[in-house]
Design a protein with these regions (language model features):
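Glycine-centered structural positions embedded in regular secondary structure
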Residues: 5, 54-55, 86, 90-99
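Acidic, Ser/Thr/Pro-rich low-complexity intrinsically disordered segments
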Residues: 1-41, 97-232
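Short, aromatic- and glycine-rich surface loops/edge beta-strands on solvent-exposed regions
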Residues: 42-59, 191-193
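Predominantly extracellular/luminal regions of secreted and cell-surface proteins
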Residues: 59-92, 218
């Protein structure tokens, strides 16, 4: 893993990378991921971040919380800011990437058989970041001459109930988009991901995880540590 921060023991300066005027450092190190998930002892989580599986560990002598997933992992790499340069990925998958530099757009491409069902989650706001991600899903069909016909399958920004829940007593909503995808036909599909707040922001800390996962019903139990207001 690469640890980035200030006063990192054994860290090397990152040329041209600063935060609030301070030089940042990086360190390549091994990090032991605990077998048991959880963040016991590291404080109360925000509602919006409680959806993500986490594990508490240490890196460079500092306690950290890591996001974890049991999906096959891929790290964003290369020039994929155009549909024609989309990064080919397997499914299911967990892609780790960045909304960086400013105006960054990333494209990914995968194949799916007819009738396959996947949930497509773009996770960033749930990582505790001030982002507003969105996804665009295309179906791509090529003729014998290699010419493409592109059809929009879905364009997803905020979840449908987001606006109605902001400011309510129990608000665990998020700006992260999530879409249930049922493949209409065997073939190729492309996903574009971007941050609506990233037009003028040039910050490598704005990370995301693109998760394409099988449908798997589950139960999540949360508790809110404040008194709820009641109607008169």
């Amino acid at each position: 893993y690469t640890i980035v921060g200030r006063n990192v023991p054994g860290g090397k300066p990152l040329e041209g990378v600063t935060l609030n005027g301070a030089q940042l450092q990086s360190l390549q190190t091994n990090v032991q991921i605990p077998a048991d998930l959880g963040v016991s002892g590291l404080g109360v989580q925000k509602m919006v971040t409680s959806r993500i599986a986490r594990a508490a560990t240490t890196a460079a002598g500092v306690a950290v919380v890591m996001n974890v997933s049991d999906l096959p992992s891929v790290v964003e790499s290369g020039d994929n800011d155009e549909a024609s340069k989309a990064t080919k990925i397997p499914v299911p998958v967990n892609v780790s990437g960045q909304f960086y530099p400013a105006r960054d757009v990333d494209w990914y491409e995968f194949n799916a058989p007819q009738g396959a069902v996947f949930w497509i989650d773009l996770v960033s706001h749930q990582l505790g970041l001030p982002t507003d991600p969105s996804i665009l899903l295309h179906r791509v069909v090529k003729n014998d001459a290699g010419e493409e016909t592109v059809t929009v399958v879905a364009s997803v920004d905020d979840p449908g109930d987001r606006n109605g829940r902001i400011g309510q007593d129990y608000d665990d909503s998020t700006d992260d988009p999530s879409y249930k995808f049922t493949s209409p036909a065997e073939g190729t599909y492309r996903i574009r991901v971007l941050d609506n707040f990233g037009v003028n922001r040039n910050d490598p800390r704005m990370q995301y995880e693109l998760r394409i996962r099988p449908e798997n019903p589950r139960v999540r139990l949360t508790a809110e540590l404040r008194q709820l207001k009641t109607a008169n």
